[in-house]
Amino acid sequence: MIRHIDIAVQKIFEMKEKEPAKFKKLIDEGIMIGLGVDLGDRSREEYTAGHIKEQSRPKDPDYAAVTEAVIEGDSEETVRLTVALLEKGKDPTDLVLNALMPGIQTVCELYDIGESYMPEILLANEALIGGVKLCQERIGEIRYEGKVVSLVIEGDLHDIGKNIVAAILRANGFEVVDLGNDITVEAAVKAVKAANADLVVGTTLMSTTKEGLKVLAEVLESEDVPVACGGAAVDRRFVETFCNSVYGKTPLDAVKIAKNICAGKSWKEVRNDLH
């Protein structure tokens, strides 16, 4: 007979493999309890999907409907509701900050605890973009934390990870110029100059293409635009072999890098802090 402890261990390892975010939360909470820190009911409650949604829901019911549409990844409904509110005279900047952004932020927080997945983030991101574009038409430029160019380097067509990073950067207040996948160094440099970007986030899933990130970082050094490098084929050791680059293992690392670069830190300072 299999003991209960064996079943529990098996399930824990399955969670680590299939739901790493949820596994991390479990481990973090377990460590705190082991150290004698009482998390209390409220702390545990904050890890639940229901609590996260409740905390992010705007008090204004019209705004809450927009937020929910973004969470559900319903682009058509998001656009319809945004148009209706703009026609009612709602401030477009306020709509972006307090109706649209809470939606994508909620989905990203749910992803962090293993309660949402890549397809849901991508759908929410599309819904967000649809609403933001409508608001931009009314107000012109929206003030962002900074401008980031996002891309998958030449030779690699895999862009799911890049899309996740772009969505989470947008959720944290950054303007993202998404170039897509299979982007040459020349095209990337041209786009960076045209956008006057603060940072490039470059990813690749393939070891055969990762050298392109090195070339891009070296070329952009003269433009004083660093490259945050990530993806399955990239690790810290590789990134530290060339200048003007910082390694990010997770999408949230990209946010940390962007915030530090846009705050005026050099790539060397950011690398020293985060590596």
From Swiss-Prot:
<dbReference type="InterPro" id="IPR003759">
    <property type="entry name" value="Cbl-bd_cap"/>
</dbReference>
<keyword id="KW-0479">Metal-binding</keyword>
<dbReference type="GO" id="GO:0046653">
    <property type="term" value="P:tetrahydrofolate metabolic process"/>
</dbReference>
<protein>
    <recommendedName>
        <fullName>Methylated-thiol--corrinoid protein MtsB</fullName>
    </recommendedName>
</protein>
<dbReference type="Pfam" id="PF02607">
    <property type="entry name" value="B12-binding_2"/>
</dbReference>
<dbReference type="GO" id="GO:0046872">
    <property type="term" value="F:metal ion binding"/>
</dbReference>
<keyword id="KW-0170">Cobalt</keyword>
<comment type="similarity">
    <text>Belongs to the methylamine corrinoid protein family.</text>
</comment>
<dbReference type="InterPro" id="IPR050554">
    <property type="entry name" value="Met_Synthase/Corrinoid"/>
</dbReference>
<dbReference type="GO" id="GO:0031419">
    <property type="term" value="F:cobalamin binding"/>
</dbReference>
<feature type="domain" description="B12-binding N-terminal">
    <location>
        <begin position="53"/>
        <end position="147"/>
    </location>
</feature>
<dbReference type="GO" id="GO:0005829">
    <property type="term" value="C:cytosol"/>
</dbReference>
<dbReference type="GO" id="GO:0008705">
    <property type="term" value="F:methionine synthase activity"/>
</dbReference>
<feature type="domain" description="B12-binding">
    <location>
        <begin position="145"/>
        <end position="272"/>
    </location>
</feature>
<feature type="binding site" description="axial binding residue">
    <location>
        <position position="158"/>
    </location>
    <ligand>
        <name>methylcob(III)alamin</name>
    </ligand>
</feature>
<comment type="function">
    <text>Harbors a corrinoid prosthetic group and acts as a methyl group carrier in methanogenesis from methylated-thiols.</text>
</comment>
<dbReference type="Pfam" id="PF02310">
    <property type="entry name" value="B12-binding"/>
</dbReference>
<dbReference type="InterPro" id="IPR036724">
    <property type="entry name" value="Cobalamin-bd_sf"/>
</dbReference>
<dbReference type="GO" id="GO:0050667">
    <property type="term" value="P:homocysteine metabolic process"/>
</dbReference>
<dbReference type="InterPro" id="IPR036594">
    <property type="entry name" value="Meth_synthase_dom"/>
</dbReference>
<dbReference type="InterPro" id="IPR006158">
    <property type="entry name" value="Cobalamin-bd"/>
</dbReference>
